[in-house]
């Protein structure tokens, strides 16, 4: 009897302990499920409120049958997972064990680890290069990390270069067509001129669109070539990083001074071009204003030069003619005067030639006395010749006349 009562009391205590354990286990399971659901919703971008606790325990067999590590398939009656769990918690069944609770917690931990691993993989795709681990203390590990870092920097630089080139091409393309539109707006006759020159007015729009598409195709082709060149450089850098880095650095070091020199030359040429163009326009403008007066002045000056030259030549010819005529006339007059002159003394009987002596005649001037002596009265030893310069025809005529007059005098 006492043994029976003892068994009954033990059974009651075991039932009370079992019910308390079931309630506690159900609470743990519900909290774990709600935490798991909240984590999944947060990863998906939504957050669901926590469900309220239920007092009824979950049947152990049905919960064990439904809860697994794998995802639960949809049921035939169309009920979702949460409603099934709620129904299972409201039913009365056997107690849930601690092993099942641990399985649920392990499932939650496994799911969280999988989600974290997916996030790490996504980050590694965006940033493929990882910093070296603290354990990689050898020189080769640091060198490998340095090479990877250089590759990443060069890859980013290549992408930025291609992006800047594309932006520059787009800007130039936009500026070109804006300038064309403004020119057509400011100078409407340009469109008519182009249409009359290259075709009908209806086809000018088609021609502009064709040129625009052609320019776009050239721009795309050039951008593709640039991208292909950058890719080739990147692949060469992966294969031979030192040689490629040396070539790129040498090319950059050569391109920079060449670009500066080219820029200076272009700037200087452009400056002088505008200076010469301005001077040409100014000189052309003023010459067009004063072309008629300048031509008139030059014509008058040419007429004056020709007139003065003609008058000078004529005056020289007239003076020469007058001088020659006067010289001839004076010569004739002197000849006549010499013929009409009579001797002032009578002739005496002549002495022999051997006894004759040259006697000076004071009536004859001294120059003529020295030169005008008849050769039959004097000898060669007694004749004294002095240089007499005949500067003109008048002097020569005077000398001739004096010679003729001297021959008629009898020198004693």
Swiss-Prot record:
Topology, Cytoplasmic side: 1-170, 269-271, 315-412
Polar residues biased stretches: 357-373
Residues covered by region (Disordered): 347-374
Gene Ontology annotations of biological process type: lipid droplet organization
One Gene Ontology molecular-function label: protein-containing complex binding
Positions of transmembrane segments: 171-191, 248-268, 272-292, 294-314
Keyword annotations: Endoplasmic reticulum, Lipid droplet, Membrane, Transmembrane, Transmembrane helix
Record InterPro entries: Osw5
Subcellular location: Endoplasmic reticulum membrane; Lipid droplet
Lumenal topological domain: 192-247, 293
Oligomeric and partner information: Interacts specifically with the seipin complex FLD1-LDB16. Only a fraction appears to associate with the seipin core components, suggesting that it may be an ancillary subunit of the complex.
Official protein name in the record: Lipid droplet organization protein LDO45
Lineage: Eukaryota, Fungi, Dikarya, Ascomycota, Saccharomycotina
UniProt gene name: LDO45
